[in-house]
């Protein structure tokens, strides 16, 4: 009887361990890169490519005061949330991709923009916002007025996120050492790094070494893709198994989000590119985890 009890207990522990392994890393894709920015069809497409979730965008920004955001409308709030839930598609994060082109330093309404994003996150159950700094130029990368202004605005936005139990992940384009310095200046628990493999690969930096330098607690989420060339399964610029082993040792867990890594010969084939990349990441980070 005792032996049977121990056998059952051991089997339960194996199942629990397997469940944890499946959930340690989850895989999503960016709606705007799949040509589904704030379109209801993004959830069905996410299901079709086999992803666990989708990173929704806030909508275009341009010269607008606020994002072109459908989810300020109660009708779309209910419709989008119901559709995502009914298909079992999670929304781990919401992107402010408008700041790839717009300069945050020159925006006086940064708090309003942050609140718009945080409200949308709350509706969709997301905990992480993506904020790229690509549109803010390069002057802020060195000491001076531009950096001081950016740091203050990011601090303000971070505190709004912190108060709601959320995080804004910034994409800096800098190496780990410089990024850590920037985070210390911002000094807000609501601001972390949204790590992008593409930046380090393009700069010739070692992805695994940069991840280790950043450390588990500074990384909110990861864009696990590179500059368009080939899909991840054929790209020699990143050793994804080594990346997984690095993250395992760091004790990091969370969402890996496909942004690019499109085959330039089939750049418009959304299902092929994102489906291939999602399957590859799942093979490495989920199926591989179950075999350990």
Show the residue positions of the predicted features.
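Sec/Tat signal peptide C-region and signal peptidase I cleavage site
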Residues: 17-21
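Bacterial N-terminal signal peptides that target proteins for export
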Residues: 1-7
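Charged helix-capping and loop-helix junction motifs
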Residues: 70-77, 108-115, 143-154, 206-212, ...
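Active-site acidic/histidine proton-transfer and metal-coordination neighborhood
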Residues: 85-87, 100-193
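Bacterial N-terminal signal peptides
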Residues: 7-16
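Histidine-acidic metal/acid-base catalytic patches
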Residues: 22-27, 35-52, 176-191, 195-292
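Glycine-rich, proline-tolerant flexible connector loops at the mouths of alpha/beta enzymes
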Residues: 57-81, 133-141
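Conserved beta-strand positions in the central sheet of alpha/beta enzyme cores
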Residues: 55, 93-95, 130, 169, ...
């Amino acid at each position: 009887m005792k032996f049977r009890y121990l056998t059952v207990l051991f089997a339960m522990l194996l199942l629990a361990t397997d469940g944890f392994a499946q959930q340690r890393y989850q895989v999503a894709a960016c709606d705007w890169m799949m040509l589904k920015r704030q379109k209801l069809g993004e959830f069905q497409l996410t299901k079709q490519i086999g992803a666990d979730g989708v990173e929704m965008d806030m909508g275009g920004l341009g010269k607008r005061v606020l994002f072109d955001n459908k989810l300020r409308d109660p009708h779309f709030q209910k419709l989008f949330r119901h559709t995502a839930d009914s298909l079992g598609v999670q929304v781990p994060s919401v992107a402010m991709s408008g700041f790839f082109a717009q300069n945050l330093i020159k925006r006086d309404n940064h708090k309003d923009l942050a609140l718009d994003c945080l409200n949308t996150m709350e509706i969709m159950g997301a905990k992480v916002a993506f904020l790229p700094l690509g549109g803010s130029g390069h002057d802020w990368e060195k000491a001076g007025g531009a950096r001081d202004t950016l740091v203050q605005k990011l601090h303000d936005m971070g505190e709004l996120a912190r108060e709601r139990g959320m995080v804004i992940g910034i994409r800096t384009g800098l190496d780990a050492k410089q990024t850590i310095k920037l985070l210390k200046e911002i000094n807000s628990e609501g601001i972390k790094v949204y790590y992008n493999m593409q930046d380090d690969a393009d700069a010739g930096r070692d992805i695994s070494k940069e991840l280790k330098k950043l450390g588990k607690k500074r990384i909110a989420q990861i864009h696990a893709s590179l500059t368009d060339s080939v899909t991840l399964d054929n790209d020699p610029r990143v050793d994804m198994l080594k990346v997984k082993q690095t993250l395992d040792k760091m004790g990091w867990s969370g969402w890996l989000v496909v942004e690019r890594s499109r085959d330039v010969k089939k750049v418009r084939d959304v299902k092929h590119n994102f489906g291939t990349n999602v399957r590859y990441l799942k093979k490495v980070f989920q199926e591989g985890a179950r075999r350990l």
